[in-house]
Design a protein with these regions (language model features):
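Acidic, metal/ion-coordinating pockets
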Residues: 1-197
Length: 197
């Protein structure tokens, strides 16, 4: 089974590009399932129901989000109604929607968990405190994908090591990571650089 994970779809231009490229790419690469991050799909940022419909009509099967999703008040109304759009599980039980979902392909069920890192992102609980119970929720799924939306590479690597042998994939298909220096690429953000910055 071929599963495609797509990082942040940004704005109307990103949605339009997706619609023009994804159908042909799915056919060319024999993609069975597409999971995309839609937290910045609305103009500016956030996600709206119209942006979500644009993404789905392009050929995406499932949408994950991140911290920017909640910048649009509309999201609070449709997250509870959609099982194919999930929010980070560790943003609090009071938030609408769920932090996990299942894609039922008939013979194969794919469990998807959405988490949010804590470094440089406000408002999230420790993702390690909830991941075991979330993995239990999707234990009947043959394929288990964890999308950890995080800034620090160290958080993503730590989650990957923790879920080694438990999850099929731990991914972070996001483009907002800091990439200025090798230290920053490896999650060592708070170490001072020699040039004083």
């Amino acid at each position: 089974m071929n599963i495609l994970l797509i990082g942040d779809i940004v704005g109307t231009q990103g949605c339009d590009f997706l619609r023009s490229v994804l159908p042909g790419f799915k056919k060319f690469k024999a993609i069975d399932v597409v999971i995309a991050n839609g937290e910045n799909a609305a103009p500016g940022n956030g996600i709206t129901s119209s942006a979500a419909e644009h993404i789905f009509s392009s050929g995406v099967d499932f949408i994950t989000t991140g911290n920017h999703a909640f910048r649009r008040s509309e999201v609070y109304h449709f997250l509870d109604e959609r099982s194919d759009i999930i929010r980070p599980a560790n943003v609090g039980a009071a938030c609408p929607g769920k932090g996990f979902g299942v894609i039922d392909m008939g013979r194969v069920r794919i469990g998807v968990i959405n988490l949010l890192g804590r470094a440089y992102i406000n408002g999230s609980d420790n993702p390690f405190s909830c991941i075991d119970s979330l993995m239990e929720e999707i234990s009947d799924c043959r394929i288990k994908i964890v999308d950890i939306h995080a800034e620090a590479t160290a958080e993503k690597l730590a989650m990957g090591f923790y879920l080694d042998g438990k999850a099929t994939a731990v991914a972070h298909p996001c483009s907002d990571c800091r990439r200025k220096s090798p230290a920053r690429r490896h999650g060592l953000y708070n170490r001072p650089r020699h040039d004083g910055t």
